[in-house]
């Protein structure tokens, strides 16, 4: 749980997870044909994990939590195995092009937000926003929008 909490400090919000949620995720992986790999440091502490599914022609990563670029690289290398393609969705703020300059990327927008009561929002957050985009802009961390857990 510590590596998850550390990773999430870089984002504007996240879902709080407890041990029971991680146990449920492990059980789901076992029953849905997914794999879960963890990377441990020399002291045996988990420094990252990757949840993925091997397909016929590629590996699809559904979640990757890591404490640094070295850990990320090792996790993805282990996940890709003998496949030639790995698919990973990340926020733009992670800047993976620095770690993987030759990786092909494409932008995909998939979150839509509507602020139902702007006066209430402004009062609660001591803000002066007029649109949902303005509301996102008042946060100084990149968005983390994982709606699965």
Q: What is each model feature region?
A:
Residues 62-149:
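Active-site/acyl-donor-binding loops of N-acyltransferases
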Residues 1-70:
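Amide-forming acyltransferase catalytic core, primarily the GNAT-like/NAT-type
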């Amino acid at each position: 749980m510590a590596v998850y909490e550390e990773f999430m400090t870089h984002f504007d919000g996240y879902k709080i997870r407890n041990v029971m949620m991680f146990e449920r995720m492990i059980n789901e992986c076992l029953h849905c044909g997914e794999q879960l790999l963890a990377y441990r440091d020399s002291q045996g502490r988990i420094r990252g994990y990757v949840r993925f599914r091997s397909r016929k022609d590629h590996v699809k990563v559904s979640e990757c939590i890591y404490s640094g670029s070295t850990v990320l690289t090792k996790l993805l290398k282990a996940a890709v195995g003998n496949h030639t393609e790995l698919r990973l969705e990340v926020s733009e703020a992670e800047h993976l092009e620095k770690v993987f300059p030759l990786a092909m990327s494409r932008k995909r927008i998939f979150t839509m937000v509507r602020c139902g009561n702007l006066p209430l929002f402004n009062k609660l957050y001591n803000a002066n926003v007029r649109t949902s985009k303005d509301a996102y802009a008042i946060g100084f961390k990149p968005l983390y929008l994982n709606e699965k857990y």
